């Protein structure tokens, strides 16, 4: 079970593409829990990936972004541990830069352990969501480092407030700059016309630090996102180091207002919408938990044909593709975090992680998903036992953590 070493001979290993769910292959076993499909999802699995990095890229930064790994992920590069995440539904980033080998073979090893992960439904097993290798300049937009809010929306104009976090990974201070351009997006994610832009804005970054700045842009005659017409825009942030373009970071968003009222229910853009939703687990039935965007879109089209207009991501963070589809197809989303808090429902469930990880897992979900117009609310839990002990203050605490990263919902 020590397969992270660089020199491990993996030539005889099975070759496959991720996303991958090893458990859906079966076989079914009568002795296993029916709640998790009587499938052999509990076990330990290893993945290894070889890749080369050009010697020309020695001054670049390299990251691996995982959308989800089931579960208790540990990640190594060339035998050196670079990070991981225990919660199988959380996205996370690891920094590969210190251990990258240039001009020769690099090996990423990922160990997953679902034996120490409890679930009340079928979770799948493996690297079941997408992984991306990210290469950047030392001065770049931080991970999920753009937050677009829309404080003013009228028929005549709208205001987009763009909050940008820029990182400086150099060993010296940098006088940087950034610009923001806003474009219309069509249904196929193609950029249409530019509708707003800024001049270059200066930012001073000390060595090894990040800086957050914000700018407001006025968009004339905004097209509002709604369930019938899913108009979207793109905020394009360009970062400069000594007038050299070092990063371009795109963030889709939409103009829309949401309001819950005591006498007229939910209002989208000032108009009442009867929420008709379903609670959706992340698996794709017989296809398992491995992300398949076409299969997921099929599920959503079937639900819409029934009259469904809303989704609850029961009971965990969804794949990013779900929210992308909800934005495009016109669905409202309750974006959910946890099935339990400090009191568990199954052995080795999230209650064993709550104290150490809940704030980080909240930050991850909210920062990743807060720009989606389809997301109308955050859910911090499902049928939690602590609801009978409000004096503990956990619900209030979780709401406060959410609002650190999103004050708009």
Predicted regions and their residues:
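Short beta-strand edge segments in extracellular beta-sheet folds
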Residues: 134, 252-256
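Accessory beta-strand-rich segments of carbohydrate-active enzymes
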Residues: 37, 42-149, 169-170, 317-320, ...
